[in-house]
Structures are given as structure tokens and as C-alpha cells.
């Protein structure tokens, strides 16, 4: 078994760079780290390019044997414990991470869904991860994100999705307003989050609706608000009015 020990190895350099959006965009790849999320990536048939393992994981049996059996079906790269800590994003690494191809090739919107969720410049990676996780939990399998929204493949977002990133199709919109106009042609109504209404998420019918979640500080862009058919208040996260989610 060959074990990489040098920081100058080209793969190691690439993995380190994948922490940056520029490299993720250029390579169309991102990282997932940890036993649970790597297991989910395998179970959900994510496009795994390589799995990176700490060279002592087999000796310590830190990774379950049944998972090691599945991991072995992929391209596996072993690195020293010291080097794994160097490439890891967490303080206490579990000795396994994977390089995965982004699931962003298909930009087609599924109009058979009753609900489409769209994000208008949501900035906080933790909020974005929570929204993806919530959307997944209620059976919505696609989400639209504006150009100004946080990167869906940011390591913090990926961790906070708890595997939802493998199941929810993320459609990046160059021009969200233009996309919404197209969706309206399919008889969907636009619902925006707003403080200027008494209606809540429990007061509307969710058949053929596009739910727009706005920026944490500024809300939904004015031009998109003007396109809205309905407005609703949404639950807030803590007292700083950060958006949590609106699907329940």
C-alpha cells in the first residue's frame, strides 16, 4: 500500500485548494469529510472521484468494516496521519474524506413538484445548509439559488446539509428574475418572505408555488417582491432575524 506523506503531492495540493470556491468551480468538484457523510455519498451514488484515507484507519478500526468494504470499491488514496490533519477541515478528523463531482449538470426544473424553493442572495452558509436539509426532509428535490447566494459546495454548507446535498438538485440561476418569469408560465405562483404581512407559512395553499427566501439582512429583492402573488412571514433564527426556513 502506497502512502502519500508529502504536502507537495499534486493531489494534496488540489484537495487543499478545493476549500476555495475558485478551485471548486474550475474542477467541478467538492469535498465531503467524515464517516457518516462519506457513507451517505456512497449510498446515494454520488459521483465519487477519490476517497482519501488516513493510513492507520485499518489498524485502529476507526471506520466500520462494512463501510471499508464499500469504500474499497472506489479509488482509494492513503495518506499519513499528519498529512490527513493537514488537509482536514475539522479539529478531530475521522480519517476519511471524499472528492466528489458536483451534481449541477442538469439545470432542468421539475414542474411536477408542488413546491419549488428559490433563494435570493442567502449569505450565511449555515442557513443555506439548514434550508437544503429542511427542503430534503419534506420531499422537495430541487432548489434554485441566485448568483449572489452562498456557494452550495462550501465545506460548512456541505456539513450542515447532513447528506441532503446528494439528494437535492441545486440549480444555479444566472438571472433569478428571468428564471421566475419562466416558471410563472407553468402556472406557478410566487410567494415571497416578508415582514410586511400578517400571513404566515400556515396560511397558504402550497399547490404550484415558488417560495422565495431572501437575504438575511435585506430580504427579497424589490423587483422580485413586485412579481409576488402572495407574501408570508417566516420563522426566524434567534433574535437577529436570520432566516431559518419556511418549509414544514
At which residue positions do the language-model features occur?
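Post-transcriptional modification and biogenesis factors for structured RNAs
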Residues: 1-247
Amino acid at each position: 500500500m502506497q502512502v502519500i506523506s508529502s504536502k507537495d503531492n499534486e493531489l494534496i495540493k488540489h484537495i487543499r485548494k478545493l476549500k476555495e470556491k475558485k478551485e471548486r468551480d474550475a474542477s467541478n468538484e467538492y469535498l465531503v469529510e467524515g464517516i457518516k457523510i462519506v457513507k451517505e455519498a456512497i449510498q446515494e451514488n454520488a459521483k465519487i472521484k477519490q476517497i482519501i484515507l488516513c493510513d492507520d484507519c485499518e489498524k485502529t478500526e476507526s471506520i466500520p468494516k462494512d463501510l471499508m468494504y464499500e469504500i474499497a470499491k472506489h479509488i482509494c488514496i492513503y495518506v499519513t496521519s499528519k498529512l490527513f490533519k493537514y488537509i482536514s477541515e475539522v479539529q478531530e478528523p475521522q480519517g476519511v474524506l471524499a472528492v466528489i463531482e458536483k451534481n449541477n449538470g442538469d439545470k432542468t426544473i421539475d414542474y411536477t413538484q408542488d413546491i419549488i424553493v428559490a433563494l435570493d442572495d442567502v449569505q450565511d452558509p449555515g442557513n443555506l445548509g439548514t434550508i437544503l436539509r429542511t427542503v430534503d426532509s419534506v420531499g422537495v428535490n430541487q432548489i434554485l439559488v441566485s448568483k449572489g447566494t452562498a456557494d452550495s459546495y462550501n465545506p460548512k454548507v456541505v456539513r450542515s446539509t447532513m447528506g441532503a446535498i446528494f439528494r437535492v438538485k441545486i440549480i444555479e440561476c444566472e438571472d433569478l428574475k428571468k428564471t421566475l418569469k419562466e416558471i410563472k408560465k407553468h402556472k406557478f405562483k410566487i410567494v415571497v418572505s416578508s415582514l410586511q404581512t400578517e400571513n404566515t407559512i400556515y396560511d397558504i395553499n402550497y399547490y404550484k408555488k415558488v417560495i422565495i427566501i431572501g437575504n438575511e439582512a435585506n430580504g427579497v429583492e424589490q423587483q422580485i417582491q413586485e412579481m409576488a402573488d402572495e407574501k408570508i412571514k417566516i420563522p426566524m433564527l434567534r433574535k437577529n432575524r436570520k432566516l431559518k426556513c419556511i418549509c414544514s
